[in-house]
């Protein structure tokens, strides 16, 4: 897959914001900010109350990563619709499936999640693929930047 569009958007962005819809997604957004921060101003926003702040302050030269498990949460879909109207470049990060969130984003990244039954505790879905994805994205972006120099 060619990630040039995403790399160009990040390179030209004034700010890159990350927003996770749940606790695991918020941890992924926080880790994304940590590893990318030396190269770009990354802002990690979390909590439903912060979505209103994003909507008010977003600019056309912002890139926003919207990290969601299913991509079907009404909150995330409404947020994407509103941010899209403001002209920001949106990238969804969801599990591999056709989903509503991806429809409102300029580009999408997908993970293949693993479900496990954990005794009597029910199903468990690993967040590890999200962390692998953002780390690979970071490495690829560093290589792309090195080639451009």
Where are these regions (language model features)?
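Glycine-rich phosphate-binding loops that contact phosphosugars or nucleotide phosphates
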Residues: 11-132, 136-145
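A short, well-structured juxtamembrane/interface segment
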Residues: 1-12
């Amino acid at each position: 897959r060619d990630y040039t569009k995403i790399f160009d958007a990040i390179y030209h962005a004034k700010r890159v914001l990350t927003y996770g819809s749940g606790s695991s997604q918020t941890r992924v957004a926080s880790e994304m900010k940590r590893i990318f921060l030396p190269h770009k101003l990354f802002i990690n926003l979390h909590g439903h109350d912060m979505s209103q702040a994003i909507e008010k302050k977003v600019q056309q030269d912002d890139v926003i990563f919207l990290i969601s498990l299913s991509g079907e949460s009404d909150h995330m879909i409404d947020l994407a619709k509103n941010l899209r109207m403001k002209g920001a470049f949106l990238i969804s990060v969801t599990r591999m499936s056709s989903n509503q969130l991806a429809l409102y984003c300029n580009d999408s990244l997908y993970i293949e999640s693993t479900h496990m039954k954990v005794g009597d505790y029910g199903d468990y879905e690993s967040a590890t693929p999200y962390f692998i994805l953002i780390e690979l994205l970071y490495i690829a972006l560093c290589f792309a930047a090195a080639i451009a120099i």
